[in-house]
Amino acid sequence: MASKRALVILAKGAEEMETVIPVDVMRRAGIKVTIAGLAGKDPVQCSRDVVICPDASLEDAKKEGPYDVVVLPGGNLGAQNLSESAAVKEILKEQENRKGLIAAICAGPTALLAHEIGFGSKVTTHPLAKDKMMNGGHYTYSENRVEKDGLILTSRGPGTSFEFALAIVEALNGKEVAAQVKAPLVLKD
């Protein structure tokens, strides 16, 4: 069986932990991850001034699709940039139409709202993004640290990044693989 594939869309101002932790955990699970730079292949400055080098531009990565999951990290500016991108809208619409998994964390789910993705789903966000996410009544809000409703998987923030990443692994590769990846991470239960 071919390994699963993930597209992580990296925008300027993305939250570092919400980008790197899911990438690392998914790669540990054997998922082929592509970090795609929204603005190209140049290094991206994240919300706390960590610089991440994308594997490809979003334009080039899109040509290699479809992906088993599209991941949207948070960070206020990063989420705003994802929300304003026509390319992100196109990728999310294609992913939704083909019934592929979409995962977003922290403020990242607000890009789902901006692009009208997953309406009717139960979601969670960073507490500061809750009001924005609930504007218009398109979603049901959950206070859970990670919420999976069908093919929409959301999480709350930097402190839930490992749980978010492991939920993606479980959705793509099953509980057993997620447990195998989790064990050596020495996470608190």
Curated annotation (Swiss-Prot):
Catalytic EC class: hydrolase
Annotated Pfam families: DJ-1_PfpI
Modified residues (Cysteine sulfinic acid (-SO2H)): 106
GO cellular component, one term: plasma membrane
Modifications the protein undergoes after translation, according to the UniProt entry: Sumoylated on Lys-130 by PIAS2 or PIAS4; which is essential for cell-growth promoting activity and transforming activity. Undergoes cleavage of a C-terminal peptide and subsequent activation of protease activity in response to oxidative stress.
Main localization category: membrane
Matches recorded under InterPro entries: Class_I_gatase-like, DJ-1, DJ-1/PfpI, Prot/Nucl_acid_deglycase
Modified residues (N6-succinyllysine): 182
Topology of this chain in the membrane: Lipid-anchor
Residue positions bearing lipid (S-palmitoyl cysteine): 46, 53, 106
Keyword Iron tagged: no
N-acetylalanine PTM positions: 2
Protein name: Parkinson disease protein 7 homolog
UniProt keyword Heme, yes or no: no
Phosphotyrosine PTM sites in chain numbering: 67
Molecular function terms from GO: copper ion binding; glyoxalase (glycolic acid-forming) activity; mercury ion binding; mRNA binding; oxidoreductase activity, acting on peroxide as acceptor; peptidase activity; protein deglycase activity; protein homodimerization activity
CDD domains: GATase1_DJ-1
Species per Swiss-Prot/TrEMBL record: Chlorocebus aethiops
Modified residues (N6-acetyllysine): 148
Membership in a protein family: Belongs to the peptidase C56 family.
EC number(s) stated in the UniProt entry for this protein: 3.1.2.-, 3.5.1.-, 3.5.1.124
Location relative to the cell: Cell membrane; Cytoplasm; Nucleus; Membrane raft
Reaction it catalyzes: N(omega)-(1-hydroxy-2-oxopropyl)-L-arginyl-[protein] + H2O = lactate + L-arginyl-[protein] + H(+); N(6)-(1-hydroxy-2-oxopropyl)-L-lysyl-[protein] + H2O = lactate + L-lysyl-[protein] + H(+); S-(1-hydroxy-2-oxopropyl)-L-cysteinyl-[protein] + H2O = lactate + L-cysteinyl-[protein] + H(+); N(omega)-(1-hydroxy-2-oxoethyl)-L-arginyl-[protein] + H2O = L-arginyl-[protein] + glycolate + H(+)
Positions annotated as active site in the UniProt record: 106 (nucleophile), 126
Residue numbers marked as site, Cleavage: 149-150
Keywords assigned: Acetylation, Autophagy, Cell membrane, Chaperone, Copper, Cytoplasm, Endoplasmic reticulum, Fertilization, Hydrolase, Inflammatory response, Isopeptide bond, Lipoprotein, Membrane, Mitochondrion, Nucleus, Oxidation, Palmitate, Phosphoprotein, Protease, RNA-binding, Stress response, Tumor suppressor, Ubl conjugation, Zymogen
Co-factor binding comment: Deglycase activity does not require glutathione as a cofactor, however, glycated glutathione constitutes a PARK7 substrate.
